[in-house]
Amino acid sequence: MTYPNLLDRFLTYVKVNTRSDEHSTTTPSTQSQVDFATNVLIPEMKRVGLQNVYYLPNGFAIGTLPANDPSLTRKIGFISHMDTADFNAEGVNPQVIENYDGGVIELGNSGFKLDPADFKSLEKYPGQTLITTDGTSLLGADDKSGIAEIMTTIEYLTAHPEIKHCEIRVGFGPDEEIGVGANKFDAEDFDVDFAYTVDGGPLGELQYETFSAAGAELHFQGRNVHPGTAKGQMVNALQLAIDFHNQLPENDRPELTEGYQGFYHLMDVTGSVEEVRASYIIRDFEKDAFEARKASMQSIADKMNEELGSDRVTLNLTDQYYNMKEVIEKDMTPITIAKAVMEDLGITPIIEPIRGGTDGSKISFMGIPTPNIFAGGENMHGRFEYVSLQTMERAVDTIIGIVAYKG
């Protein structure tokens, strides 16, 4: 189905810079997200027909569309995030490519281009309307496509009361891209049976497995002396960091793994001979494998300290989120419904693990099973990001089908 306001709504949203800031100590992490929620989203939530609309101190804009059929007793939530990833989000100037011809798309005058030879996903979209960047910023389809789709769903249902639906709760939240947005989510206040994050990629994505995730902060304490007299005295912290890294499995890196394979990822190293700090992330799907990865890092640190005769290697491990499959597989109702709706719409469900996390990873463990459905974005988090308008329309169709489902 086509929705006349969907494209303009999306273009309005992406032109607002809502980049999050991982170094901030506030919630939301940037004032621009507060302004976007209070000045743009909340007024529009009221205009499209949501009731009991309010903004919480945790950064979430919340609203409700009451059920219009007493036989549909479920309460279902839909959640998307306002922030965009760590890439330029100022001066977003989207290009609208109607009836895409399957060829190369020049991204404004930037010198960058979307070429099917480099981005095979483009082969799916001839004849469709694509929204791209101008090459100077990201687009923000992650996740403003989701926000636009949810808002358009509410607008359509309000205008078409003949479509019977259950109670719908909507939540637009902050700071998903920096991994903290759902930390303060108020599950009791949201009060639904289950929810969906509308934060996926291409048409048909339906996901209920995420990584389990941890962060590892390492400190290597060296002893710097003049290299000319260093023998037997110097302890080079840089070499300690290298030795530690070399004891990790050499093939367990993001660039060498896929599917259900986990990894260690060295994110950052700073330091000198005297001391080094290194940051890793640890990812795996199975709980035992996840715990084993953390234990392995601790074992390497302990062994090095024993061999060095002092505690020169300090490791701090912090769990970040867990595989939501552990919660959702106890009651697959949200997956069963979404799958049935997609199939009824002629959409092939793509049920694969997310090699990452979503707000749903944390919200599921707060008592609201929250799988993820497609929002349409491709090549997210950079200048090559784009989205198909037709995929966004199909996302709206899917949300409508979910809330009207009577099975």
Swiss-Prot record:
Gene Ontology CC terms, in alphabetical order: cytosol
Listed Pfam families: M20_dimer, Peptidase_M20
Catalytic residue list: 83, 176 (proton acceptor)
Binding sites annotated in the UniProt record for Zn(2+) 1: 81, 142, 199
GO MF assignments: metallopeptidase activity; tripeptide aminopeptidase activity; zinc ion binding
Keywords for the protein's UniProt record, in alphabetical order: Aminopeptidase, Cytoplasm, Hydrolase, Metal-binding, Metalloprotease, Protease, Zinc
E.C. designation(s): 3.4.11.4
Cofactor(s) it depends on: Zn(2+)
SUPFAM superfamilies linked: Bacterial exopeptidase dimerisation domain, Zn-dependent exopeptidases
CDD domains noted in UniProt: M20_peptT
Annotated cofactor note: Binds 2 Zn(2+) ions per subunit.
GO-annotated biological processes: peptide catabolic process; proteolysis
Catalytic activity: Release of the N-terminal residue from a tripeptide
InterPro entries found in the cross-reference section: ArgE/DapE_CS, Bact_exopeptidase_dim_dom, Peptidase_M20, Peptidase_M20_dimer, Peptidase_M20B
Annotated function: Cleaves the N-terminal amino acid of tripeptides.
Family indicated by similarity: Belongs to the peptidase M20B family.
NCBIfam families, A to Z: peptidase-T (TIGR01882), PRK05469.1 (NF003976), PRK13381.1 (NF009920)
Name the record gives this protein: Peptidase T
Upper taxonomic lineage: Bacteria, Bacillati, Bacillota, Bacilli, Lactobacillales
